[in-house]
Amino acid sequence: MFIPYVIEKSSRGERSYDIYSRLLKDRIIMLSGEIHDELAASIVAQLLFLEAEDPTKDIYLYINSPGGVITSGFSIYDTMNYIKPDVCTICIGQAASMGAFLLSCGAEGKRFALPNSRIMIHQPLGGARGQATDIEIQAKEILRLKTILNDILAKNTKQKVAKIAKDTERDFFMSAQEAKEYGLIDKVLEKSFK
């Protein structure tokens, strides 16, 4: 992946940054692509760093993700709740599956999407192989995770758990405006809010 560099001029001279490091200076984190352990570790580290820099200033988490590994997403979610700063979530492009879950987990009143964003929720995906007992163990675990996800989504959207369970039985796609009406986000952004 090509990563652009920017030059910043100051009284002490010029300094070169990769674009993500430059955005981090403005408390912006980019969550882009499939969510897996390596990406989650990077997001968690950035959240913790920004909290250490200033625990009173908001952090802006931009999301463009098709989803990914549940436990990786939970590590980001738990860190968002663990740190003191509010985490504002902004969907750019798409927030599907775990991406949509994390979008909904931003600070209340600070969950956004750009007008042409696509948001999708569904039940956890999984597969199991092995002996019947192993498959049964995996099935119980995925049902447990489904319950946790549905409970958190219900809390975040102020929908009933039964509605979340019904809507996530299959892929449930929404426009930015529909996601606002559903309660996944608080506002559709036409212009930058910073």
UniProtKB/Swiss-Prot annotation:
Phylogenetic classification of the source organism: Bacteria, Pseudomonadati, Campylobacterota, Epsilonproteobacteria, Campylobacterales
Top-rank taxon: Bacteria
Pfam families recorded: CLP_protease (PF00574)
Residues annotated as the enzyme's active site: 97 (nucleophile), 122
Gene name, Swiss-Prot/TrEMBL: clpP
NCBIfam families: clpP (TIGR00493), PRK00277.1 (NF001368), PRK12553.1 (NF009205)
Family (UniProt): Belongs to the peptidase S14 family.
The protein's Enzyme Commission number: 3.4.21.92
Organism annotation: Campylobacter jejuni subsp. jejuni serotype O:2 (strain ATCC 700819 / NCTC 11168)
Protein name: ATP-dependent Clp protease proteolytic subunit
